[in-house]
Every structure is written in structure tokens, then in C-alpha cells.
Amino acid sequence: RIISTRHPNSSDSIIVNWRRVGELSKMYSQGQPIPFKTISVKLLEDIKMFLLRAPMGGNKKGTISQNTASTYFSILKAGLKQAFIDEYLTVDISAKVKGITNIEKPRVALTMNEVQMLVDTPCKDDVLKRAFLFSILTGLRHSDIQTLRWKQIQQTSKGTWQAVVIQQKTKRPDYKPVIQQALQLCGIRPDDD
């Protein structure tokens, strides 16, 4: 309930993460409440170590990744920071504990040969293929392409094209350049937009 009250405009993924942090906190404390007066640097360090070996959710086997643990610990620290602001804590304990370091993951990109192979590969669903290729050329997520309308594809003052989308995940506008090849995948622009 506090999630929807404090963060009414949060995306589903943010809410899922907050809930998962709650589940893992209960798991750490074996279902017992953790009173504010017992929260200490040592407790947070213990929780940090717990998160680094915490189980995956659902029916998945194994432990969460270090980057997921980092996200969850940041959420926990944000909650404690808010508890300090709301005067449930007299000390900003969140500032006294370092977060979990994220591991940089290399971004995997398709080579031009791989893209050409995809272009040349037959597909029964032409719309799906064009949407996939549009995604490759623009960097837009499939979920954002599904809701994309012509009025969101605009010509800039320099004569180039861009897609203006409200990112489903972040709820913020994002401006993605649309090259001519990507524009051609969209077909003919209707008069009614």
C-alpha cells in the first residue's frame, strides 16, 4: 500500500521490485518485524550479504544476480532514507552503508551481416518482421513500437525524422532518430494520422 501511496506513477517493474524487496526482507527476518530501533549499520551489512545470495523469485532456481541485489539494496536504502525524512529514524542510516556495486555488462549488438540475414529471412508475419527491423534501426522496445502512432513520428527542423515515445518502463518522453530505412518499414502515412 505504501508503494502506491508514495509512488502512484511508478511503472509496474518498479512496483514489482519494491514488493520483491519486501518479500526478501521478510525472508531475511524469518517473517518477524524489524523494529526501527534495531536498524544499524551491522544489520544493513548483514542484509546486504543476504541479498548477494538471495534466491530468485517465482519458480526460478538459483540466486539473484549482483546487479539485481544492487537494485534491491538501493530500494531498501531509499526506504530507510524516507523513514529518516519522516522521522521514524533519528539517524540517516542509509548514508552510512555503501551500496552493492553493479557489474558492467557489455551490450550485445547485431552485426550488419546478422541484420542482413534477418532481412533476407522469410517470415509469415510481415508486420512482426517490420516491427522487429524497426526496433533494430531505432532502438525502440517492442512494447513501445506496438503503441507507436504516426503522429509520434515527427520531422525535425533539420529535416531528419524522430520518434517521440513515452517509454512504457519510465513513463518519460524519449526521442529516437528514425532513419529513412526505418521510415520505409512503416508504410504510407495515412491522411488522418
Over which residues does each language-model region extend?
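Conserved tyrosine-mediated DNA breakage-rejoining catalytic core shared by Y-recombinases
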Residues: 96-104, 108, 147-188
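Residues marking the start of alpha-helices
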Residues: 6, 32-35, 60, 106, ...
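Surface-exposed alpha-helical interface segments used for non-catalytic interactions
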Residues: 42-45, 74, 116, 180, ...
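Short, intrinsically disordered, charge-balanced linker/junction segments flanking boundaries
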Residues: 1, 183, 189-193
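A structural signal for short hydrophobic/aromatic patches embedded in well-ordered alpha helices
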Residues: 18, 47, 118-119, 186
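Short, aromatic/basic-rich helix-turn unit that serves as a nucleic-acid recognition element
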Residues: 1-22
